[in-house]
Structures are given as C-alpha cells and as structure tokens.
Amino acid sequence: MFGRLLLLGILFHVVFLKSIFDIYFVTPLIHGMKQYSAGEAPAKRLFLIVGDGLRPDKLLQPHSEKVIGEEQTYAAPFLRSIIQNNGTFGVSHTRVPTESRPGHVALIAGFYEDVSAVTKGWKKNPVNFDSVFNQSRHTYSFGSEDILPMFSEGASDPSRVDTFMYSSELEDFSSNGIVLDEWVFDRLDELLAQSLEDKELWDMLHRDKIVFFLHLLGIDTIGHNKHPDSVEYVENIQYIDGKIQELVDKMNNYYNNDGASSWVFTADHGMSDFGSHGDGNLDNTRTPIIAWGAGIQSPTHEKNYGHDEYSLPWNLTEIKRIDIQQADIAALMSYLVGLNFPVNSVGQIPLDYLDCSSRRKAEVALMNALEIGEQYNLKSASKDQTSIFFRPYSPLRNYTEVQASFYNSVIADIESGEYEIAIEHCFHFSQTVLSGLRYLQRYDWLLLRSIVFFGYLSWIGYVICFVFSLNIEPSSKIVKPVSVVKRVAFNIPFLLICIFFYIQSSPPFYYGYALFPTIFLQLIHSIFPNTKLGFKNFLTVAKQKHGFSLLKILFISLCILCLLQFIVYSYFHREGFSVILMGLAAWPWLLHADYAFSHKTISVSWSVLTSLLCFFTILPVNKKESLLFIFAGGFAMSVAGVFYILYRRNQAFQYSSTVTNKQLVLQVLIIMATVPVTLKIADSLQRNIAIPPILRLVAFGLFITSYIIPSHHIRSCKHYFLDRLAILFLTFSPTMCMLSISFEALFYVVLFITLGLWMELETELQKYTEQLHPEYSRKKDAKFHLSLSHIRISLFFYIFINVAFFGTGNVASLSTFALDSVKRFIPVFNPVTQGALLMYTILVPFIALSAAFGIMNKRLGGIQQVTFFLAVGMADIVTINFFYLVKDEGSWKDIGVSISHFCISNFLILFITALEHASAILCKNITYTIHEKVN
C-alpha cells in the first residue's frame, strides 16, 4: 500500500516538475525567420575579446601601491587611454545565471538562453540557434574547450568557425591564470605567422566579415582561487592590458594600418568579493564594455553623464558612460562587420556607440526593429494555427499592416530628416514587439496554472485522506466499489481537456497534468468512508489525551498552515528559520510544561542547542575562507568525540554493543590529524605556496581512512543506537573539516547533537505521555493510533530538512559556490568532480538527519511511513506557493532563485524517500535495549 502510494507520488512530482518550464519558460527559439542586415559595414574584421569573470571596477579603478606597485596607479592604462582618446565605454549588464554559457550566448547570439537549455549538457553545450559567428564569413576562436565548441558545433557550417583550444588540465586553480591567456595570445601569433606562408589563409584573413574571438579565462581562474581583491587578480588584468596593446600594434602592422578593424572588449560575467558568480549580485551582473576602431564613436566629453557612485572612483566622469544590455553587443558586432543580425537576437543596437550619421543610425535601428518583429510575426502565426479562438496581442493584431505602417512612417521620417523621431519609432516598435513575444509566451498560463494547482491540491488531499484511513481497526475497514457511472463522471472533465489539448497540438506532458487530478479524486472517493472513520478516531484520541475539541484541532491546523507560509518567507529570508528555531527552543516549556519542569536537564539542553542553531541562519551566506572557523569546527568535533568516549565508559550499554572504545579513539585521532593537515593546505593556497604532493596524499589518506575504519567494523555488528550515532558523527567529521571554508563544520556539530537530543526528547516525552494515559501505551495496545504527536514529528522533520540546507547558505549561495574547499583536493578545473564534492558536503547533514529520524521512529514504534507522508504533504503546501512565485521577469536574481525554490520543494518527496531508505540502511544491526555485564 505504502509502496504504491510512494511510486504514484514520485511519478506525479517528476511530471509536474516540468510544468514551470511549460508555463513560465517556453523556449523563445523559432526558426524560419526572414533575415535582416544593417547594410554597409564600417569594418572588415572584428576582434571580440572576453575577459572571463572581469569586474569593471577592478579594471578601471585606481589601486594602492600594495596591490599594483609604485610605477602604476591603474591596472589597465592602455584600455583607459582607449576610453579617453579613441572609443566608447560603459557597463554591460548581464542576466542570471551569471555563468559562462549564458553569458557568451547573450554576447554572441543576442538573446538570453531559455532555462530549458540546461539539459543540453555541461561541457560542449552545442547551441541550436543563430549567432554572430554563424553569420560571419569566417571566425577564428581561441580559448577554453568549455566555450568554443558551443558556437563551432552550432554553426550552420561548422567549418566556418575554427577553434584553437587548450585542454582542461591547463586550468589549474593552484597555478597562475596568466598561463591560460598567454596560450591564447601565442596561438593567435602562430596563426598570423602561418598566414605568411599559407596564401589561402592569408587571403581569408584579408577578406571582409572576419571575426577573431579571444576567450581569456585567466581572470576567472584567479578570481575563484584568490578572489577579485587579490594582487594576482590585478596582475592578470595588467597582463591582459599589455597584451591587448601589443595585439593592436601587431594587427595595425599586419593590415598596413587600413583602419578596417573594430575592437570590442567585455566580459561574460563579473565576480563577487568571495570569488564566486552565478547569482544576481551586482558584482556578478556588471561587466565592462569598451569598443573602439572602425565604426565606433570617439569618446564624448560630457561630465557625469551616465555615471553614478559605482563609477565615480574610476576618475572618468568627464567621459560619457553608456550602459547597455549584454544581448545588445551581438547587434553591435553584426553592424560593425556588416552581418545579418542573428535571427533569434532580441538585442537593440546601442546607437551611441556608432560613428555614423544620424540618417545611418535611423536606418540601422529600422533593420534591427524589423529583425525583432519578425520573431513575433512567425511565432504569432504558429500560435494561430494551433489555438482555438486565438487572440493576438492587441497592438499587433494585424502584424502585416502594423509593420507596413511602421516601416512607411520611419522611411518618411528619414526622408524628411526627422532622424530622432525615426529612431524613437524604432525603439517603441521594438518594445511593443518584445511585449508581444511575452504575451505569446504567457498565452496558456491561466488554464495550465489552474490544472497544476488542482493537481497539487488533489495530491495533498489524497495524502491526508490516506493517513487518516489507516487510523481504523482492520475489521472496521469499508470496501466500497466505485460504480461505472461515477467512474465515467470522474473522467468526463479529463476527456474534454484531452480533446482541447489534441486540437491545439499540445505537448504530451499537458495530458499528464490533467490526468493526475482525475486519478487522485477517484482515489479520494474510494477511501473516503475509511477516512471519515479514521478522523473520528483521531478526534476521540485527541479529546481523551489532550482535551482537544474539533475547534482546537482546526485552530492547530491553521497554525501549521501559517508556519508553513512562514517557511516560504524563510526561503527568501533565511533568518526566518532563526525565528522558527527559537519557537522550537520554547516548545517543551510552552506545550509540555509539566514534562519540561520535571525533566529540566534534557529540556534545557534542547533549548540551548536549538538556540545555538539560530545563529547559523543569520550568519552571512557568502563566506570567505576562515582558518579560525575551520580550527574551531575540528576542535569541537574532537571534543565531542572525546566526551562521548568518556561518557560511555560509565554506561551499561557498552556491554550491549560490539563497538569498542579503541575504534572510537581511532576515529577521534583521525579528526585530530585532519585539522592541522587541512589548515596547512588552506594556508598554503591562501599564500600561493606550492602544496607538497605528500601533503595532498596524506589528506586523501585521512579522507579514505575515515570511512574504511567504521565500515570495517560495522558489518555483522550489533551497535547500541547511541554508538551508531557516534560512529556516524565521527565518520563524517573529517569530511566536513576538510571541505569547510568557514562555519560549516561547527554547524555540523551543533546540528548532529541537536538531532540526537530531539530523538531522545521525543522518546522520553512519549514514555511520559503513556504513563499519564496507559490505555494508549504500545505495550498494552499494539494498534496504531494517529495522534497530534505524529503531526508534530512530521513538522519538526520538515523543519530540520530545511535547516540542514539553510544553516550554511541558501539557493543563491549554492549557485555561486566558492571553490576554496575543493581545490584542496582537486586543483585542476573539473566541474563534475568538484561539483560532486561540494554536493556531498551539502548532503552530509541530511545523512545525520536520516539516521536520527530513523532511530527515533524505531523507538517510537515504527511510525516512519506515516510521518513520512505527512511531511510530504506539508512540503507540497509550500510547493504550491513556490509554483505561483516563479518569476519570468523583474530581477534576474529573483528569477533564478524562484525556479530553484520550486524545484527543491517539489522534489522533496524524492529526497525524503532517499532519507527514509538511508535511515533503513544506517539503522541496521542496532540494539535499543541494555544488557548488564555478566560477572
């Protein structure tokens, strides 16, 4: 019975996970659009130079002598001279996620890649949309193998894009990132030298519509390792600045100063002060944009124009700062070398960057607007063919007529010399089209969101009904078959919706969204008589044990709903969990005062530990590596281990357990050895000192040994439950110490002890209650009685699941993880292995939770499956909130976080299932009784 419900629940959540992508993030990609070109090109060739992970403030601000030396004030004097004398500059604003793939897609393809594209892979990421490289005559790209294949393999003609890539082994976080950039510049030099002997290559390099792409990863590598405020980060900027100056001189000589080269220098994303990126932190979303050469406007001297507090320290306020959106750069590059705009581009060409007449700017703006409008035209026509009673976007109701009117109006303005008016019309038309595209993406929202909401509601209703249906005598169970008429009545709405979806050629998943509510309603109907009987029994027990009436039960239910809503708030403001933990600290004193005052030791200990947990959820989520915190965590682990060994020496349960003090001492010694090794490696990395291979070997040895020792002794053993918890705590302690960068190890210690205390408190509280109400004692009555304590345990379990995650960070900090810990083991860039280590660190507290929860449920009489489904039901109440809180506009940090919140909450059933199975494994061969030593 439980197995079928679990399987149905997992299938439901897997299917409904896709709902947010079908509703909120319909791919913007369409094909078959007419292409538009900006016309005559001011340049024959374009140099796109991307400083991966470069922040504009670190590039342009003055630096102290300590950082940059006595001879210089600025890290990039050449690029500053370009800004002051030759080109145009500003800040390019990126979108979340601030990672290399979406950043480069926006730069080179002109649109912000849709979320569904994350399934296309991590390494090569082949893209299936148009790009500047695809429109070029030929592109020569140099850099990382994680970026370049995206555009070569996605090109309509792959031979059009040449890639020169170094291997991932060169991306060593413990070495100097300049090596990566040096490799790029050297390969370009080799290409130029080769052209002197290769006529075909020479001829190609001297043709028009040529693009050179230099991906410089050194700054990103150094930023992750040393952080942006380090000397090494600034040194890498200095190196790039010098090499760009050399490259400009080389290219001028190579092309005989023909003045046909355009240069664009920018970044795919920035970097936080903690050496991470990924979220919407302004340090991550702001990147530099400096353009110069053919077709680029010389600097405009207009004091304070575009400047704010962010750019005042750069001492460039006399130069006009022109900010753009990252996708606008693709349109700019297309204009510079006379390419067709990428057909999926939504970027609007930044006219202030162009060195041309007002008439030419108006003509370029017109072509840009028509290119964006073509996307709406094709998408609207496609929607019209598959929708019943299609309602087009009102301002574009008849697109052909609207476009013709717009085109004629702009041409008339241009011919009459009203260029500014023409440009304004183009901008307004583009904005209208973008609004129309958004309208089409939201076209089916109301219907789909209603179906999904009803799906979750019916699932929660079925879970509640199922739990109450268990609260009856087996002999009282009512088996009532559902009549054919009722089955047909239940399925009629589903059939009507299916017909509607079929006519509209809807995706297969749409049918699944409609199917599940139908199934759940039929299941609810079939068990409802037993549910009513079980609920009556529940009310009877609640009244006899606690004196609670139906009204009080409803009030408690309302309080639980309010608490779940507060958990939703706490996902966005994690300090909310501190408030919840303070409530848990006061719980025994407020609701079980008689027990708390008669068992002060355990009650006070509980309040102290849950209060300590409060501090972790108010500490900063973005952490810098702290040797002091790492030492404190390791010291606390060692003290806890020693304390337990001393404690068990005087306890009778040591004779019931096969665990020896020798084994526990050995595990504690491993922790003690781990602490200095971790501190030495971390200190060496901070000071940029080479780590001896023997030290890394010792670290790996300690890491592996910490698992070998307990696994060697755990087989065929009978452990007393406290011994099993101690072994698990000591087993994972070295891992948490080695992979901690701040207070993670301390959090692990406090959480583990708190969970152990929760287990003991619930067990003792049940014994106390059974003494007061012996008629419900498990010894006298083997029947299952659903009570308020089961609901409380489920609620606490769900709270601790969230605390285990939010205790050391939040969703945004997870997406911007710092590599300080994993590079102690793996200095070479390897996203899969490094990501696995980081995820393992996050999962360790949940392993502790599963062990404590499993042991507690065994001691309470095997209630795990009931508490499991109650926790799932609570989680899905939160999931409904997150479903409606998913954002597809506004702050791009909020968009990414809202998606993550829904996915995490929706998949809690899988996670809780994994915890349940983990607890079954972790709780094998455990004894719960004490046998005295026989003399």
Swiss-Prot record:
It is an enzyme of class 2 (transferase). Pathway: Glycolipid biosynthesis; glycosylphosphatidylinositol-anchor biosynthesis. One of its GO terms (molecular function) is mannose-ethanolamine phosphotransferase activity. Gene3D superfamilies: Alkaline Phosphatase, subunit A (3.40.720.10). GO terms for biological process: cell wall organization; GPI anchor biosynthetic process. Its EC number is 2.-.-.-. It holds the Pfam family Phosphodiest. Its main location: endoplasmic reticulum. It is found in: Endoplasmic reticulum membrane. Glycans are attached at residues 86, 134, 315, 398, 925. Residues 1-5, 471-483, 531-547, 598-600, 648-663, 710-737, 814-835, 887-894 are cytoplasmic. Coiled coil: none annotated. It comes from the Eukaryota. It is a multi-pass membrane protein. GO terms for cellular component: endoplasmic reticulum membrane. The keyword DNA-binding does not apply. The chain crosses the membrane at residues 6-26, 450-470, 484-503, 510-530, 548-568, 577-597, 601-621, 627-647, 664-684, 689-709, 738-758, 793-813, 836-856, 866-886, 895-915. Ethanolamine phosphate transferase involved in glycosylphosphatidylinositol-anchor biosynthesis. Transfers ethanolamine phosphate to the first alpha-1,4-linked mannose of the glycosylphosphatidylinositol precursor of GPI-anchor. Target of the inhibitor of GPI biosynthesis YW3548/BE49385A. Belongs to the PIGG/PIGN/PIGO family. PIGN subfamily. This is GPI ethanolamine phosphate transferase 1. The gene is its8.
